[in-house]
């Protein structure tokens, strides 16, 4: 066993040898269990001291992209668009699936084609068209790597029913309990 395998604690050749950081809680979204990746902080280029968070999530077999702009009164309407600019010069436009909100939330369920486009191409910037102002988000090379890694992780991740997780954990605890007696 190599040092890398020992550190990762994984001897299966077909598994990824890195921690994806995927979190699944007991909460449900639209009555379905979901999992999410760690948020990636993106700098807003055209507004000082403003950041946005990019996060991916999964419900059933569907992958979602969420962006929240951390600024006051950022109203984004349902079906308002977001443009992703790739380093190749190509631009992809997504419509907001989330209801009208003034908390700066943009959500998009990624189709297989959308997923592949975002995963296989380096993003240079993202532009969100809010009600009163447009926000331009810069995406670095390191953030592109994180995006690719998180999409790979989510694609392979199976969302569990939280009850199944509890049962497995409970069975594991029972095995580890010492036998009672003197």
Regions found by a protein language model. Name each.
Residues 1-8, 180-182:
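Bacterial Sec-dependent N-terminal signal peptides
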Residues 5-72:
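An ectodomain-focused feature that recognizes extracytoplasmic/extracellular
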Residues 41, 81-83, 125-127:
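Residue-level detector of beta-strand face positions
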Residues 47, 57-59, 70-74, 87-89, ...:
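Generic structural motif
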Residues 48, 59-63, 78-80, 104, ...:
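Residues at beta-strand starts and edge strands
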Residues 62-95:
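Mid-length scaffold segments of soluble, non-membrane domains
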Residues 88-182:
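Internal interaction segment
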């Amino acid at each position: 066993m190599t040092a890398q395998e020992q550190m990762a604690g994984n001897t299966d050749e077909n598994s990824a040898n890195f921690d994806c950081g995927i979190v699944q809680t007991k909460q449900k979204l639209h009555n379905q269990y979901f999992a999410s990746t760690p948020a990636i902080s993106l700098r807003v280029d055209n507004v000082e001291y403003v950041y946005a968070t990019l996060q991916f999530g999964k419900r059933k077999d569907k992958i979602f992209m969420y962006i929240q702009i951390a600024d006051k009164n950022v109203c984004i309407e349902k079906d308002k668009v977001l443009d992703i600019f790739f380093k190749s010069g190509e631009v992809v436009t997504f419509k907001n699936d989330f209801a009208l909100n003034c908390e700066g939330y943009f959500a998009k369920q990624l189709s297989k084609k959308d997923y592949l486009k975002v995963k296989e191409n380096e993003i240079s910037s993202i532009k969100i068209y809010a009600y009163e102002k447009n926000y331009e988000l810069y995406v670095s090379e390191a953030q592109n790597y994180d995006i690719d890694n998180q999409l790979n992780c989510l694609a392979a991740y199976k969302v569990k029913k939280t009850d199944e997780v509890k049962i497995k954990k409970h069975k594991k605890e029972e095995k580890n309990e010492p036998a009672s007696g003197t």
